[in-house]
A protein has these predicted regions:
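C-terminal subdomain of the subtilisin-like protease fold in secreted/lumenal serine endopeptidases
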Residues: 277-288, 294, 299, 306, ...
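Catalytic-core segments of hydrolase enzymes
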Residues: 226, 269, 278-366, 372, ...
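Structural recognition of the beta-strand scaffold that forms the well-ordered cores
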Residues: 54-55, 113, 137, 186-189, ...
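Hydrolase catalytic cores
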Residues: 229-230, 251-253, 282, 358-422
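Active-site core segment of subtilase-fold serine proteases
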Residues: 156-249, 254-258, 264, 268-282, ...
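Primarily auto-inhibitory N-terminal propeptides
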Residues: 25-153
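Protease zymogen maturation seam
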Residues: 130-186, 199-200, 268, 417-445
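Bacterial N-terminal signal peptides
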Residues: 9-21
Length: 445
């Protein structure tokens, strides 16, 4: 245990009387009536069995235009049924079984999960599908993991935890909140389920949708912790999010495993990113990592082209680059190590990783509780909250411009984020204690 805990102990001791306090539970955020975009079609399985592929087909309805007036009907119109029948026929022709499907209107494609026989070679099937004129491409279903370094450690219920929040002590967010709170900025948290009834998260979720199995969204550790760091409510006795007035889009694309680890796959993540793009997300948080993935690659390209800030987590101890943090244009974030060591490389073509607090972070936990968490997942959440603060002040800034503000090339420290200096550069005056050159690296081209 590191030296952080003795400091925490003093604070938690004065909070012990809160341990038995009843917590008011509120209903999980419900989608507005009539909005089919918030009611995902249940998947056959959120964790596809082995021997499955994703097959992307050029099967849009005759009236469909990818960027025109998509209002949610595309997922359940009569054209979808006819497209699925054609996909079933294609599957039979190639000896496959259709398992699930989802429209990807931002790409102008339909995505199908197809299972192949145990004895078949996926490489051979993918090669055969590539020769079919209906097929845009086919790929394996990849797995992704949340970037938490250890299971959460419980904390006493207690903005009394604010004094031990790194965002409070080092980023001075209480001072920054006099200038910006991320008001009404939509932040898509693509993760495991978020506890929408938690007292620090009640009313913070504009959307709470389940792209894993289509059922009610369960309260899970990783997603709840990430959501709290980004946008926990201020002034109600728990923690304070970096952007407490941001509007969270809770998009469950990952699920909690028995060992409390977090797992996602290409299909569930693709559905959630597609939704975030279509429904006005201004920031997308991806506190996860896995292998390169063509579907997610294409979707991230669209998100970045539309000016959405995308944040990915990277493990500083990993042997190689991790996707999606190494996708060009994504803000790669690692946990801030002791001693201010150099940032890890996110990949050959990516920018150096940003460093943000990611060790012993107090945050929200399911069941109206709080816990301490560590890992680059939570460092990424800090940066997503920071982007929300910046977006309120400069809503038209591009992701590249925001990155230059976070990590100006002429700064003495090009590794650790200086939150006060960043906001001060946007405002052209000091927002809190800072010595930054406020005229350099602004929101210019």
């Amino acid at each position: 245990m590191n030296t952080f805990w003795p400091r925490v102990g003093a604070v938690l001791a004065c909070l012990a009387w809160l341990a038995g306090a009843p917590l008011a539970a509120e209903a999980q955020a419900a989608p507005p009536a009539g909005d089919e975009t918030l009611r995902p079609v249940p998947a056959a399985s959120h964790d596809p069995a082995e021997h499955t592929l994703l097959v992307m087909l050029r099967l849009p309805a005759t009236h469909f235009r990818p960027d025109a007036s998509y209002g949610g009907r595309y997922i359940d119109d009569s054209g979808r049924a006819s497209r699925r029948r054609r996909a079933e026929e294609l599957a039979r022709q190639h000896g496959l079984t259709l398992v699930d499907d989802w429209p990807m209107p931002v790409l102008g494609l339909d995505c199908y999960v197809m299972r192949y026989p145990d004895q078949e070679s996926p490489e051979r099937i993918i090669a055969n599908l590539a020769r079919d004129p209906q097929v845009e491409w086919a790929q394996p279903v990849a797995s992704f993991d949340g970037m938490a370094s250890a299971p959460p450690a419980p904390a006493t219920e207690g903005d009394a935890l604010y004094p031990v929040q790194p965002a409070g002590r080092y980023w001075h967010v209480a001072e920054l909140h006099r200038e910006t709170t991320g008001r009404d900025i939509k932040v898509a948290v693509i993760d495991s389920g978020i506890d929408a009834s938690h007292p620090d998260l009640s009313g913070q979720l504009a959307v709470n949708a389940n792209f894993v199995d289509g059922g009610a969204t369960p309260a899970e550790n990783h997603g709840t912790a990430v959501a709290g760091i980004i946008a926990a409510r201020a002034g109600n006795g728990g923690i304070v999010g970096v952007a407490p007035q941001a509007k969270l889009m809770g998009l469950r694309a990952c699920w909690q495993q028995p060992d409390l680890a977090t797992r996602c796959n290409s299909f569930t993540l693709g559905k959630a990113i597609n939704y975030a793009i279509l429904n006005g997300a201004q920031v997308i948080n991806l506190s996860l990592a896995g292998p390169p993935d063509r579907l997610l690659d294409r979707l991230l390209d669209v998100a970045l082209e539309r000016g959405i800030g995308v944040v990915g987590a990277i493990d500083a101890k990993a042997a190689g680059p991790a996707f999606p943090a190494n996708h060009r244009g994504v803000l790669a974030v690692a946990s801030q190590p002791a001693g201010g060591k150099a940032a890890p490389a996110a990949g050959a073509e990516a920018d150096p990783a940003l460093l943000a607090p990611g060790n012993d972070i107090p945050t929200t936990a399911p069941g109206g509780r709080w816990s301490f968490v560590s890992g680059s997942s939570y460092a990424a959440a800090h940066v997503s909250g920071m982007l929300a603060l910046m977006a309120q002040l400069q809503p038209k800034a591009t992701p590249a411009q925001l990155r230059r503000l976070l990590q100006p090339g002429d700064a003495l420290n090009t590794v650790n984020i200086d939150a006060c200096a960043t906001i001060s550069r946007l405002l052209h005056h000091c927002s809190c204690s800072c010595t930054a050159n406020l005229t350099q690296r602004g929101v210019g081209p």
